């Protein structure tokens, strides 16, 4: 069945109001898009901000007459008579199939592949992690995840104990186990992340070697040979003493979730406890590594 799509250029202050009005007008779906490719890298705790320039996209049944809706929108003082909008017909598709077609196996380093479950594994002899996009982020496509996966692939993790701080989907924890780690402890503040990590570990037959905790439940004496933390600069700085305490003397550290301009400050801060290496960059993001003093 075809649909009618209405796109309205607005701003973050008015997007929610427009969304509510369009739902009252019979829209079956509302989404928000970035109007000017402006990333939001580190929102304040508890906030889910919109982009300053926001596009409200509404879907209506193909038989809907949008003339009254457009007329109503023109009366809104924050839009006005000549507000920027576009109406177009959208042909129905197998959207699930279209979404699935966008995900392909990705190689990281020399040994490691991340493969969606519906794709054929390119190299059965490689280290293959089966992972589908889901509620908890982290499928290898983001530069910070890729940087961490490449680092893990470069290590000899045989019989090493690993901590994944901010485990999200569990992609780094599962990858470490598939690469030979003795065991991994995953820590995250989100129950959904804990559940997703457990499910992905079970899918990859490594759940028996993965322990998962909320921060308040982690063992007080927890230590590891390798710690990877793919979170944001603020939490990395705040948690630095705890992260340092969790790494054994001579152990390895990787930090990501950092913008290029944040890397030097975080590296300098962690140098209290670690001999830090030069930052590695991918697009706008950075990875820091170091060895525990």
UniProtKB/Swiss-Prot annotation:
One of its GO terms (cellular component) is cytosol. Gene3D superfamilies: Vaccinia Virus protein VP39. It catalyses: L-lysyl-[protein] + 3 S-adenosyl-L-methionine = N(6),N(6),N(6)-trimethyl-L-lysyl-[protein] + 3 S-adenosyl-L-homocysteine + 3 H(+). Pfam families: PrmA. The keyword Hydrolase does not apply. Belongs to the methyltransferase superfamily. PrmA family. This is Ribosomal protein L11 methyltransferase. It comes from Shewanella baltica (strain OS155 / ATCC BAA-1091). The gene is prmA.
């Amino acid at each position: 069945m075809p649909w009618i799509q209405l796109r309205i250029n607005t701003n973050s202050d008015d997007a929610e109001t427009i969304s509510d009005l369009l739902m009252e007008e019979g829209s079956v779906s509302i989404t928000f898009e970035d109007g000017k490719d402006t990333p939001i890298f580190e929102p304040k705790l508890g906030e889910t901000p919109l982009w300053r320039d926001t596009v409200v996209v509404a879907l209506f049944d193909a038989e809907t007459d949008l003339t009254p809706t457009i007329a109503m929108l023109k009366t809104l003082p924050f839009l006005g008579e000549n507000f920027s909008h576009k109406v177009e017909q959208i042909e129905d598709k197998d959207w699930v199939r279209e979404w699935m077609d966008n995900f392909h196996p990705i190689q990281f380093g020399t040994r490691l592949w991340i493969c969606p479950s519906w794709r054929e594994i390119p190299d059965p002899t490689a280290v293959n992690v089966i992972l589908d996009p889901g509620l908890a982020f982290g499928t290898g496509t983001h530069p910070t995840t890729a940087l961490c996966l490449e680092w893990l692939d470069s290590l000899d993790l045989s019989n090493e104990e690993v901590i994944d701080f901010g485990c999200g989907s569990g992609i780094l924890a599962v990858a470490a186990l598939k690469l030979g780690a003795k065991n991994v402890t995953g820590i995250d503040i989100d129950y959904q992340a804990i559940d997703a990590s457990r499910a992905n570990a079970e899918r990859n037959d490594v759940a028996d070697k993965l322990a998962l905790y909320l921060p308040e439940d982690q063992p007080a004496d927890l230590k590891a040979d390798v710690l990877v933390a793919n979170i944001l600069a603020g939490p990395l700085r705040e948690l630095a003493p705890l992260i340092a305490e969790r790494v054994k003397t001579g152990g390895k550290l990787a930090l990501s979730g950092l913008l290029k301009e944040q890397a030097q400050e975080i590296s300098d801060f962690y140098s209290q406890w670690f001999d830090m290496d030069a930052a590695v960059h991918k697009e706008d993001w950075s990875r820091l590594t170091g060895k525990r003093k």
